[in-house]
Design a protein with these regions (language model features):
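Phosphate/pyrophosphate-binding loops at sites that engage ATP/ADP/AMP, CoA/4′-phosphopantetheine
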Residues: 117-130
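Early-domain small/polar-rich strand-loop-helix modules and first-structured segments
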Residues: 1-96
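Phosphate/oxyanion-binding active-site loops and adjacent basic polyanion-contact surfaces
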Residues: 103-114
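Short glycine/proline- and acidic residue-enriched helix-loop micro-motifs
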Residues: 95-103
Length: 130
């Protein structure tokens, strides 16, 4: 055994374990503080039980600004941006996606979605503990 139980507890004390359920339509983030038996899901709006994050991005028209999740859906419905769905499938297939005559790498877009959605954890835990 590399560590005994006391040493292991010191090493991991305060550490946070993160689970990410990346789905085609919706994604969800959960976390648990090491040593506790409670798993929490990350709400997209603080104080609510809205845990599903639409797995989409939206590029705002005319600018290089990307929105994710519910904001992406909202902007696309208001016709203020271009919605990119099927992020996982597009990343698997490779190739480029063209929006407003500009090419985008689907793997980079999926990575952007992951980074933006994982930022929701900043409201719950510090990045150093993950």
């Amino acid at each position: 055994m590399l560590f005994n139980k006391k040493t292991e507890e010191k090493v991991h004390k305060g550490s946070v374990l993160v689970g990410y359920d990346l789905g085609d339509d919706f994604s969800q983030i959960s976390y648990c503080v090491y040593g506790e038996n409670v798993v929490e899901s990350v709400a997209t709006v603080i104080g609510t039980k809205q845990y599903n994050i639409p797995t989409v991005l939206c590029k705002r028209k005319g600018v290089n600004q990307w929105l994710y999740g519910k904001d992406a859906v909202k902007y696309s419905q208001e016709e203020e941006g271009f919605l990119v769905t099927d992020l996982i499938e597009l990343a698997r297939k490779g190739g480029m996606i063209t929006i407003e005559e500009e090419a985008f790498d689907p793997v980079a877009l999926l990575t952007l979605f992951l980074k933006r959605s994982l930022a929701l954890l900043n409201f719950m835990v510090t990045a150093e503990n993950i």
